[in-house]
Amino acid sequence: MAVQTPRQRLANAKFNKNNEKYRKYGKKKEGKTEKTAPVISKTWLGILLFLLVGGGVLQLISYIL
């Protein structure tokens, strides 16, 4: 590594101080939380619910008549 002048040393120290202050190496951002996607989409959930409830209603109607 090359020898640094005192002016370079001061500039590097200032730069490093600002980087450590604002970048926070390796730390996660606390403001954001990751959203997990649902296992099944709302559309498929609606279709499945329609089939189950509709089938039950048809069974009740056929039982009554």
UniProtKB/Swiss-Prot annotation:
Alphabetical list of Pfam families matching this protein:
RAMP4
- Its chief place of residence is membrane
Query: Its biological function?
Result: Interacts with target proteins during their translocation into the lumen of the endoplasmic reticulum. Protects unfolded target proteins against degradation during ER stress. May facilitate glycosylation of target proteins after termination of ER stress.
Membrane-crossing residues? 45-65
Q: Which UniProt keywords apply?
A: Endoplasmic reticulum, Membrane, Transmembrane, Transmembrane helix, Unfolded protein response
What membrane topology is given? Single-pass membrane protein
In its UniProt entry, the species of origin is given as Saccharomyces cerevisiae (strain ATCC 204508 / S288c) (Baker's yeast)
Which cellular component, as a GO term, is one annotated location?
endoplasmic reticulum
Record's subcellular location: Membrane; Endoplasmic reticulum membrane
Q: Give the note.
A: Present with 846 molecules/cell in log phase SD medium.
Q: What is this protein called?
A: Protein YSY6
